[in-house]
UniProtKB/Swiss-Prot annotation:
InterPro entries assigned: Bact_Cytoskel_RodZ, Cro/C1-type_HTH, Lambda_DNA-bd_dom_sf, RodZ, RodZ-like_C
Chain intervals with Low complexity compositional bias: 152-164, 220-235
Name of the protein this chain belongs to: Cytoskeleton protein RodZ
Location of region: Disordered: 152-235
Organism expressing this protein natively: Enterobacter sp. (strain 638)
Keyword Cytoplasm applies: no
Gene Ontology CC: one annotated term: plasma membrane
GO MF annotation, one: DNA binding
UniProt cross-references to Pfam families, sorted A to Z: HTH_25 (PF13413), RodZ_C (PF13464)
GO aspect biological process, one term: regulation of cell shape
Residues in compartment: Cytoplasmic: 1-111
Length: 336
């Protein structure tokens, strides 16, 4: 009867009460138990008071109780039935994984953004390439057109040069005829001047002797002084005029030296095309017109330009390797 009563009394005690009684029998304090089990004092107190902390999982609580029972020498089998009541195993609530779905959604959005970015980049690169190709093709067509125009201009200039030679010769011959006629008329006049009166004998003798000499005087000596006189009088005038014209022309002179074959076109302020064609290597071109000049040069690196004795800067066209289109004036030359 005593054994059964003791057993019933033991079953009536809760898990926490039995653990506290065993601790007190061993003379241990809650602080000592907490230090040995590496627990908080509040956790040991909750176990002895049969409290289940809300923030503590039942699995951990059952483990703490088992460790506490081993420490105070209580068999684990005696505590198992009471542990089911004191710390029942609660079903864990499995929360849906939001992080994976959010990451997948974010990854999908980033994928669309990257695709759009690459698409924009490809479009920009394509447009840039198309613009460069069109510009390059236009330059090639322009250079081809310039070369065709230059060859045609060279052919025309060759034909015009061949036709102009006889015309200049004829004009020179025609201009010389009036001068000869003038000299003849001037030489005849001194011969026809009246002679002083002479006796009949002297007249006859003089006619016999002088007649041959008069023929010679009419043919050669008379022409020579009059011709030289006319040349000395008339030639200085065109020389002075040419000097004045050369001085005026040099003020707007445009000099170009070529280090390689180059096509160019030069137009003055009146719209007159001074030159249009191809210049060969080591060539020099001197042009005079009314400033300012408009120049179109196919190869700027192959030409050196001087205007009014000052060089014209073509470096900006040489760097870009493009056809040079510029206007040369006195202000631009002074600024350079």
């Amino acid at each position: 009867m005593n054994t059964e009563a003791t057993h019933d009394k033991t079953e009536a005690l809760s898990t926490g009460v039995r653990l506290r009684n065993a601790r007190e029998q061993l003379g241990l304090s809650q602080q000592a138990v907490a230090e040995r089990l590496c627990l908080k004092v509040s956790t040991v107190r909750d176990i002895e008071e049969d409290k289940a902390p809300a923030d503590l999982a039942s699995t951990f609580l059952r483990g703490y109780i088992r460790s506490y029972a081993k420490l105070v020498h209580i068999p684990e089998e005696e505590l198992l039935p009471m542990m089911e009541k004191h710390a029942p195993v609660r079903a864990a609530k499995v929360a849906p994984m939001q992080t994976f779905s959010l990451g997948k959604r974010r990854k999908k959005r980033d994928g669309w953004l990257m695709s759009f970015t690459w698409l924009v980049l490809f479009v920009v690169i394509g447009l840039t390439g198309a613009w460069w190709w069109q510009n390059h093709k236009a330059q090639q067509e322009e250079i081809t057109t310039m070369a065709d125009q230059s060859s045609a201009a060279l052919n025309n200039s060759g034909n015009n040069g061949a036709q102009s030679v006889p015309l200049n010769t004829d004009s020179a011959s025609t201009s010389s005829e009036p001068q000869t006629a003038e000299t003849d008329s001037q030489t005849v006049e001194p011969v026809q001047t009246p002679a002083p009166a002479m006796t009949p004998d002297q007249t006859a003798a003089q006619n016999a002797v002088v007649s041959p000499s008069q023929a010679n005087v009419d043919s050669a000596p008379a022409v020579t002084p009059t011709t030289t006189g006319n040349v000395n009088v008339t030639q200085p005038l065109p020389t002075d005029q040419a000097g004045v014209a050369a001085t005026t022309a040099d003020a707007n002179a445009l000099v170009m030296n070529f280090s390689a074959d180059c096509w160019l076109e030069v137009t003055d302020a009146t719209g007159k095309k001074l030159f249009s064609g191809l210049q060969r290597k080591d060539g020099t071109l001197n042009l005079t017109g009314q400033a300012p000049y408009k120049l179109k040069i196919g190869a700027p690196s192959a030409v050196q330009i001087q205007y009014q004795g000052k060089p014209v800067d073509l470096s900006r066209f040489i760097r870009t390797n493009q056809v040079a289109r510029l206007t040369v004036s006195a202000e631009q030359s002074a600024a350079q």
